[in-house]
Regions:
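Structural detector for internal amphipathic alpha-helices that build alpha-solenoid repeat scaffolds
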Residues: 1-12, 21, 32-47, 67-86, ...
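Amphipathic alpha-helical scaffolding segments comprising HEAT/armadillo-like alpha-solenoid repeats
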Residues: 12-24, 44-60, 82-99, 121-132
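Short inter-helical turns and helix N-cap capping residues of alpha-solenoid HEAT/ARM repeat scaffolds
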Residues: 26-27, 64-65, 103-104, 134-135
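Short, mixed-charge aromatic SLiMs
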Residues: 31, 100-101
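Residue-level recognition of hydrophobic positions within alpha-helical transmembrane segments
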Residues: 98, 105-106
Length: 137
């Protein structure tokens, strides 16, 4: 777990594939930190952000551990600015889906926070519409 966390401190090193692999197969405590470290590694540009986001999107959807899904949502929000279309739109749609449908309230809250922090007018409008329709409070 400490290794997965500390790898995020070296985003220029060749750490992307080991972090992706950890997020796929390791224990929950390691996956949790691998998600956060992938955000740091991916923030160095689109070439690293895109594969990091691809794995984070998968983990957001299928990981059995709520804390890993929550960290994946946070990490996707952090990577958003480094991504290009259509990946940015996929991140928004996945976070919206998670915010509305995840069975854990903490994961839903983290997805909403990630969306709000994107500071994208069209995303904020969608959130406001969901509030007005009574789907969000």
């Amino acid at each position: 777990k400490a290794v997965a966390w500390s790898l995020g401190n070296y985003p220029e090193a060749p750490i992307l594939n080991p972090l992706i692999r950890s997020l796929q197969v390791d224990i929950a405590a390691v996956r949790l930190w691998a998600a956060s470290s992938l955000a740091e590694a991916g923030c160095t540009g689109p070439a690293k952000a895109d594969p990091a986001a691809a794995q984070l999107l998968l983990s957001l959807r299928i990981d059995s551990e709520p804390a890993v899904r929550s960290n994946s949502a946070w990490a996707l929000g952090r990577l958003y600015g480094e991504l290009v279309e259509p990946r940015q739109q996929l991140v928004v749609e996945s976070l919206l889906h998670t915010m509305l449908n995840d069975f854990e309230s903490g994961v839903r809250d983290e997805a909403r926070l990630a969306l709000e922090q994107l500071e994208q007018p069209e995303v904020l409008e969608r959130l406001q519409t969901l509030v007005e329709e009574g789907l969000l409070s």
